[in-house]
Amino acid sequence: MVGGLLFFGGAATAFRLFSHVQSRVDIWLHPFADPDGNGYQLVQALYGFAWGGLVGRGLGEGMPERVPYAESDFILAAIGEELGLTAVMAVLLLYGLVVERALRAALISRDGFGKLVATGLAAVFALQIFVVIGGVTRLIPLTGLTTPFLSYGGSSLVANWVIIAILLRISDQARRPLPDLTETEDADEQATQIVKVVDR
């Protein structure tokens, strides 16, 4: 409740203070009002999805160059035009699989910190996908985020691989068997190492 109020309050404040936010919201609500100007990118992306249909026009047969920044923000529109709705759904299923595996890693993690980290990273990944695909399909206003593992952009790619690496580490740690403890040992002794200091 509090988070929602803060989000919508911040969004309303940003809309009033920043002209580029107003421009993006206007493009989102009325893209065909200026199809050759501010709304050109979004209109061409929607046309690309429409031309692609169910199975697309064929790999390499589309015209993604009509969409500005098709290699980054709007790469999903290029996929939709050339390979159709089928390929777009396949991409979404792969992203869903990554999120599902991240949540599964959170569930099997033995420590609370690992659970929180895995859940948070799954939420970050899912939110990024929702924002990107929502913007390209006109579900929400455009933001300029890149599509994970598909869009051109070095820092975004590195950040997403770091997320995957952390999730793999949490999953690996959770799946390792617990050490066998003898009658005279306990977990604290296993985690403690005595270091002898030699005086010189």
What are these regions (language model features)?
Residues V2-V91, S109-V117:
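Hydrophobic, glycine- and aromatic-enriched re-entrant/interface helices and adjoining loop segments
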Residues G96-A106, L167-A174:
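Structural signal for the C-terminal ends of transmembrane alpha-helices
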Residues G56, T86-L93, F125-G134:
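Hydrophobic alpha-helical segments of membrane proteins
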Residues D36, A87-L97, V117, L121-V124, ...:
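Residue-level signal for the membrane-embedded core of alpha-helical transmembrane segments
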Residues A11-F15, L94, L121-V131, A165:
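Alpha-helical transmembrane segments of multi-pass membrane proteins
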Residues V21, L103-R110, T143, A174-P179:
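Membrane-interfacial segments
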Residues A106-G144, L150:
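Loop-to-helix entry and N-terminal half of a specific, functionally important transmembrane alpha helix
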Residues I133-R200:
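A juxtamembrane structural motif centered on a specific transmembrane helix
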